[in-house]
Structure formats: C-alpha cells, structure tokens
C-alpha cells in the first residue's frame, strides 16, 4: 500500500517543474505588478503569440484565448480586482441589449443613466473616497486615517471604453453585440487595458470578427512602436526619474533655484515619456495582433497654445470627453456663460 502511494506521488523536480517559479507566474505580486516593459511580459508575449497564430483561422477560440489571457494579465497587474472588469462587462452588455429592445425614450435614458452610475460610481469610489474623506474628516473628529482602498490599475480606461459602447447604443450610433465573448474581448483587450489609449466601441468592434491579417507593414510598424515605447519608458523616463527628478524633489533645499527649475522640466519630460511610451507599446502590440488603435500623443510639447496642447496630449481622452461629455452638455451652442460652465465640467471630469 505504501509502495503504491509513493508511486503515485509526483516528484515535481524530476518532471523539471520549479514550483516556486510556477507560483510566481500564476499569482499576483503587489511588489512586482506586470508591466509591458518587464522582461517577464515580453517572454510571455512571445509564447502567447505562438498560440495566437495557431488559432489564426479559429476566430471564436482565438477570442476566448485572448480574453482569458487579458484577465490573467489584469490579475497580474491588479490582483483580485480583475472581478471589476467582469462587473463592468456583464452589466453594460446586458444594459445595451435591453436598450435595443426598449422603444420608450425615458426607459432608454434610465438604462444609460444606470450604466453611467455603475461605471462612474466604481471610478469615484476607488479614486476619490479617501480624497473626500480627508476633506470632510475635520467636520467629524478632526483625525484622518485613510481607508484601505487599493486603486485598480487602468480603471479609468476600461470604464470609459465601456461607457462609449452604452452611450453609442443609446444614441443609436451602434448596434449592440449579441455575443458576450465579443464584448468581453473588447473591454479587456490587454494592450490598452492598463494605460490606454481609450479605444471606442464603434472603432474597435468592427475589427473583432474580421479575418486575422497582419501585413508586413503592420508588423514593421508594430515592432517600431514597441521598441520606441520601451526606449521612452525604460531608458528615458526611468533614468530621469531615478537619477534626476527624485533627487531634487526629495530634497529641494539642497539644490539651487536653477537646478529646481531643471527638475521641473525633467519631470515634464519624465511623465511624457512614461505615458506616451506605454501608449506606443499598446499601439505596437495591437498591430502585431492585427488591430488598429488611434494615436494618443502628437508631440504635445511642440504646442503653441493651451488649446493646441489639449489637442495633442492624451488625444483619446480629450476627444472622448469632447464627444461624450462636452457636446452632450451643449458644447458652445448655448451662450458664453453656459460654454464656460461646460468647459469647467469637462475639465473637472477629465481629472477623474
């Protein structure tokens, strides 16, 4: 009996399986969340690409595989908060389906308001509960102890993406999807999941079931975007941050006024290279998988006015706010005062 038990016991080492390494790959590590610029992700993407190519002709299987990988990617980035992706996906999918079957305008409006409440409610809870609590604490007991609320990575991006879908369906600009898998694929698609760009439903959904085709031009552009994005993020941004900006910002009194000024300019360059580097990598990864994303930055520091800068920085967000918020509020069509109020509200919500 003992002999049989020993025979059935798997010797993982003999099988060449490193359990510690397996645990590291499969579990979330808050100290080392998965990011595009990590060697681990790049190796994982190569393995992912092989399976992706094998499923080239099997569209549904490929969509399922990518969706599962996207959820795994988000789990490795934010831990158990990947369930929020599921909540947003299922609720907005069902609300949009219901909207399509509803004739009465007020009922359709209630459904889109419901979608807004779910998405913006989640966003405000995770981003602003502590902010408002800190402001109101003096009114209660004078002491502020921050609540233990973790900010899930990329929550702004996937909530805004999902809202673009329900709002477009409400406006009858888009027919709702009949497949939950297709919608889950759209919301969770890993290249833009954690740092954008915000890809609108009307631009992305028509690409989902198209035959997979990656031309040599797309492949070349994809590699270029990934390499340039990696250079911006891992070389320029990280180097400036560690060796320059953090030293000055941590002890500004030790440095001259001119050095502090250089620190401010260095920080401006750091955040641009960090953010646009991620966007470039996302655009490049999507191209390698056969998908097109909109550009997110257009040399913003070459802008000659604040308005021009707004048009060049985080373009997918500024155009989203313009089309779904500013124009919905009335834009500049209702007099000067109303225009200023609309602009302030748009900027305020843009800060989310």
Predicted feature residues:
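Short, Lys/Arg-enriched N-terminal segments with co-localized hydrophobic residues
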Residues: 1-6
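Membrane-embedded transmembrane alpha-helical bundles that form the catalytic cores
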Residues: 8-352
């Amino acid at each position: 009996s003992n002999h049989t038990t020993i025979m059935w016991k798997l010797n993982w080492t003999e099988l060449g399986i490193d359990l510690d390494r397996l645990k590291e790959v499969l579990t979330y590590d808050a100290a080392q969340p998965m990011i595009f610029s990590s060697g681990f992700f790049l190796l994982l993407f190569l393995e992912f690409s092989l399976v992706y190519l094998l499923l080239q002709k099997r569209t549904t299987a490929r969509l399922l595989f990518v969706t599962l990988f996207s959820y795994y990617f988000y789990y490795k980035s934010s831990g158990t908060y990947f369930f929020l992706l599921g909540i947003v996906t299922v609720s907005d999918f069902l609300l949009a389906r219901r909207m399509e079957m509803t004739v009465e305008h007020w009922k359709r409006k209630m459904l889109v308001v419901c979608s807004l409440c779910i998405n913006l409610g989640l966003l405000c809870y995770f981003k602003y509960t502590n902010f408002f609590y800190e402001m109101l604490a003096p009114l209660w007991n004078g002491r502020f102890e921050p609540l233990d609320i973790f900010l899930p990575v990329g929550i702004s991006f996937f909530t805004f993406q999902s809202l673009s879908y329900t709002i477009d369906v409400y406006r009858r600009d888009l027919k709702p999807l009949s497949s939950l898998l297709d919608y889950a694929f759209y919301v969770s698609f890993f290249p833009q999941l954690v740092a954008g760009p915000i890809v609108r439903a009307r631009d992305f959904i028509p690409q989902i079931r198209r035959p997979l085709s990656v031309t040599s031009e797309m492949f070349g552009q994809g590699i270029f975007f990934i390499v340039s994005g990696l250079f911006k993020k891992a070389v320029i941004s990280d180097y400036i941050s560690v060796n320059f900006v953090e030293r000055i910002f941590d002890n500004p009194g030790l440095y001259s006024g001119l050095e502090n000024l250089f620190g401010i300019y260095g920080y401006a360059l750091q955040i641009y290279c960090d953010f646009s580097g991620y966007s470039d990598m996302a655009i490049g990864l999507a191209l390698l998988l056969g998908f097109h994303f909109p550009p997110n930055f257009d040399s913003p520091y070459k802008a000659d006015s604040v308005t021009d800068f707004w048009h060049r920085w985080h373009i997918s967000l500024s155009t989203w706010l313009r089309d779904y918020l500013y124009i919905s509020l009335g834009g500049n069509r209702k007099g000067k005062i109303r225009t200023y109020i609309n602009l302030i509200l748009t900027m305020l919500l843009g800060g989310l």
